[in-house]
């Protein structure tokens, strides 16, 4: 259980349809069932 704060906040997957946060090992969204998940961005995008 040596999980850093950064790992806990950033190691997630985000649904492309409803933007729900999902665990990293998820195959589909927990809210809407959509299969297209992306990993949460770990760096801010520049303008």
UniProtKB/Swiss-Prot annotation:
A Pfam family of this chain: Ribosomal_L40e
Recorded superkingdom: Archaea
One Gene Ontology term from the biological process aspect of the record: translation
InterPro entries on file: Ribosomal_eL40_arc, Ribosomal_eL40_dom, Ribosomal_eL40_sf, Ribosomal_zn-bd
Swiss-Prot/TrEMBL keywords: Ribonucleoprotein, Ribosomal protein
Hydrolase recorded as keyword: no
Gene3D superfamilies with a match to the protein in the record: 4.10.1060.50
SMART domains: Ribosomal_L40e
Gene Ontology MF annotations: structural constituent of ribosome
NCBIfam families the record matches: PRK04136.1 (NF003161)
Entry similarity comment: Belongs to the eukaryotic ribosomal protein eL40 family.
Name used for this protein in its record: Large ribosomal subunit protein eL40
Species of the source: Halobacterium salinarum (strain ATCC 700922 / JCM 11081 / NRC-1) (Halobacterium halobium)
């Amino acid at each position: 259980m040596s999980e850093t704060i950064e790992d806990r906040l950033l190691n997630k997957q985000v649904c492309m349809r409803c933007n729900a946060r999902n665990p990293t090992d998820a195959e589909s969204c927990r809210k809407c069932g959509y299969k297209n998940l992306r990993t949460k961005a770990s760096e801010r995008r520049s303008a």
